[in-house]
Amino acid sequence: LDYATRILFGHIGLELVEAPFDLPLPAKRLSDGTLRFLALAAILLQPSPPPLICLEEPELGMHPDMIRMVAEMIADASAKTQLIVATHSEHLLTALQDDFDVLFAFDAGLTGSIVRPFSQEQFKKWREEHTLGELWTSGELGGNRW
């Protein structure tokens, strides 16, 4: 996987070059998930990242295999910067279940959101039988729609 840039009619274009094909694909022909993956890679793989990176549903539009790759980039970036990640994805939660310091669940209350923190110690007890993604989809961690 490689990329190329091209200037055409005064505009800079990004093109993706994927093995075994040597034909560059312009960004406008790439899927939304691929474009989002490339944007996340640019953010998370910075050699000198900002002190805080916030990601809102980084899994959107991605195949579960790509979500695992995003989770690896998030885990690696967390060694260099603080990250706040909001997700509704059981795949992302499961892929990150060993790489968080604090987990929060948000539930709807009558006058606003109710925030509940969960520690690694609490999670270790649950982890004996379930993945973090399973706990999320079961409603055990909150975040319920109703």
What are these regions (language model features)?
Residues 17, 22, 31, 40-42, ...:
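Short, well-ordered helical secondary-structure segments
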Residues 50-52, 65-74:
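Substrate-recognition/cap regions that form aromatic- and gly/pro-loop-enriched pockets
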Residues 2-45, 58-65:
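Conserved ABC ATPase signature
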